[in-house]
Amino acid sequence: MDDNIAGSGFHGVYLLYCVNPKFKGHTYIGYTVNPNRRIKQHNGGVDKGGAYKTSRKKPWNMILIVHGFPNDIIALQFEWAWQKPTVSRRLKSAATKKKPRERPVQYCFRILSELLRVGPWNRLPLHIRWLMREYEMEFDPRCLPPFHMTVVYGPLVSRKAKQKAVSSEDQRPDHKEKCIKCLDVIKIDEKLIRCPKSGCTMTAHMFCLARDFLHCGNEGGLFCLPVDGNCPQCKGSLLWGDLVKPAESIPSAEDVDEDTDDHWTQGLRL
């Protein structure tokens, strides 16, 4: 999948940077299902759907967005913690107060670095996307994001929700396939996972493979969401996020904000 095309269930938390000379350097953090539309709303003012806090300080640049959240609830929790780090219980052990001479955008990025390393978000296959590379900042070597998260660049392309990405289910052959772990036939309404390694034909129930990854990583009973593991067939190293990566599509202008599609994490709930 093209990493710049964002299908079912895009949820992003973004950082705005004010370029109005009178307020230059001010920042704003928000949540969106459509970054391209949201920045137009912010720069259009309250009458165009923008936030009251950004209306009198426009124009703004959307410089960074974190996406890959499984649903709006988890993304909104992340947004709240990023907006209010000094009162977030997730960051109790971190230095959340703004340092002397620390610019607002530097402070926001430092708090982001801390958030990516704490639960529940530290196990999610998130993408940290620099929409405008001239604003890019390097992570402190002492506060790097988890290895399974990626730093990517460039704008996201809107796509109509009806243009679904081809999934593993869409590619199923006519003959019945068995789960490599439980050996049961994988039914058409069950989540199927394939090994992406060339030449490997491994197929498994999503839940069975998740349990296997957690057990092999000695994380069984601690978490319900694995981070990585090895293919039971070819033994290749796999990131869980690559196996279950959804087709994150940004709704086009005429689409509504609400997203009701199920996400792969639904299948991990006991």
UniProtKB/Swiss-Prot annotation:
Pfam families from the UniProt entry: GIY-YIG (PF01541), SLX1_C (PF21202)
E.C. numbers: 3.1.-.-
Name this protein carries in UniProt: Structure-specific endonuclease subunit SLX1 homolog
Keywords, comma-separated and alphabetical: DNA damage, DNA recombination, DNA repair, Endonuclease, Hydrolase, Metal-binding, Nuclease, Nucleus, Zinc, Zinc-finger
Cofactor: a divalent metal cation
UniProt zinc finger (SLX1-type) residues: 179-234
PROSITE patterns with a match to the protein in the record: GIY_YIG (PS50164)
Protein's cellular compartments: Nucleus
Similarity comment: Belongs to the SLX1 family.
Spans annotated as Disordered: 251-270
The UniProt record lists the keyword Signal: no
Major localization class: nucleus
GO molecular function, one term: crossover junction DNA endonuclease activity
GO cellular-component term (any): Slx1-Slx4 complex
One example of a Gene Ontology biological process annotation: double-strand break repair via homologous recombination
Entry keyword annotation includes Chloroplast: no
SMART domains assigned to the protein according to its UniProt record, in alphabetical order: GIYc
Subunit (UniProt): Forms a heterodimer with a member of the SLX4 family.
Record domain GIY-YIG: where: 9-94
Function: Catalytic subunit of a heterodimeric structure-specific endonuclease that resolves DNA secondary structures generated during DNA repair and recombination. Has endonuclease activity towards branched DNA substrates, introducing single-strand cuts in duplex DNA close to junctions with ss-DNA.
